Amino acid sequence: MTHRFLEACRKQPVDRLPVWMMRQAGRYQPSYRAVRANVGFLELCRSPELIAQVTVAPIDEFGFDAAILFSDILVHLPAMGLDLSFEKGEKGKGDGGPKIANPVRTRADVDALKVPAPKKDLPYVLDGVRAIRAALRDRVPLIGFVGGPFTVASYAVEGGSQGFTRLKTMLYAEPRTAHALFEKLTQAAIVQIEEQIAAGAQAAQIFESWLGELDRADLEEFAFPYLARIAEAVKRTGVPSIFFSTGTTAHLEPISKLGYDVVSVDWRIPIDEARRRAPGVAIQGNMDSTVLLGPKEVAVERALSIVRAAGREPGYIFNLGHGIQPGTPTETVKAVVDAVHAFAWK
């Protein structure tokens, strides 16, 4: 079966624009909140049955053109030797941010990290992928994902605190330690995404959310080489690859040459400019998720303005510039999806 999302990833013509949204399974959904009323976040991430339930729900509720595996970019850290937990939020069930009790601070800490073996250490993720594929019945494709090395390192080194001071200091004070850490995290990302694809994921997104913290020189030394290796690993599997980051539009040209099929951009760049500056890749994005918190009519018009600006050329996927925020009205999400699907050039 041909899927318009996968065709758009490969810059092929589609019958209508594909749309999905980051965090399309999340706290804005009553169905998700009902699940979370009974289980903690990590408990949810470790239940294949619940992973499938919350992953498939947005497809049924909103008609998205792709599902994305429900998991977390840090779910593998315990297998690497780090003590991961999620702070208690308002509901007391781990809705808050991640905390790492034994953060990575020294070369000895890096050397002690183990590269996970997903079949042994993360079977619930792979079983979740298989359960999702069975539940979807090929209605839409499934996107697997991992976190990028810098973003995962920011949590592993900082321990959950806000900011990037310790990690960025490591780049300058102990560059060999930083490279050793990024090497371990790159290996971890590659084995995870390869196993997700082997289990049935039909595309792969790399979330390098905090890459905008780095300048060009640091990107070229500490980020781009590792990200290119992940892209090459995905390419060997034959499924499309998507790169996501925020705050990096100044570096769009080199990012578009890392080897990914799709580059997902945030709202800080006009979508037509992104397409001009990165002609070799498909573009995904890029509505500010905060727009969805405003009037429904405003969100629909903003979405359509982005679609028009993206132009007629194949290789465009409508998405947000970041994840859907808690409190977003579900009727607004549905209205935007329907409007993008109904759009046609006159």
Swiss-Prot record:
Enzyme class: lyase
Residue sites binding substrate per the record: R23, Q24, A25, G26, R27, D72, Y155, S209, H322
InterPro entries, A to Z: UROD/MetE-like_sf, Uroporphyrinogen_deCO2ase_HemE, Uroporphyrinogen_deCOase
Cellular location(s): Cytoplasm
GO cellular component labels: cytosol
Keywords for the protein's UniProt record, in alphabetical order: Cytoplasm, Decarboxylase, Lyase, Porphyrin biosynthesis
Catalyzed reactions per annotation: uroporphyrinogen III + 4 H(+) = coproporphyrinogen III + 4 CO2
EC number of this enzyme: 4.1.1.37
Site, Transition state stabilizer: residue positions: D72
Gene3D superfamilies for the chain: 3.20.20.210
PROSITE patterns per UniProt: UROD_1, UROD_2
Alphabetical list of Pfam families matching this protein: URO-D (PF01208)
Similarity section: Belongs to the uroporphyrinogen decarboxylase family.
Name of this chain's protein: Uroporphyrinogen decarboxylase
Organism: Anaeromyxobacter sp. (strain Fw109-5)
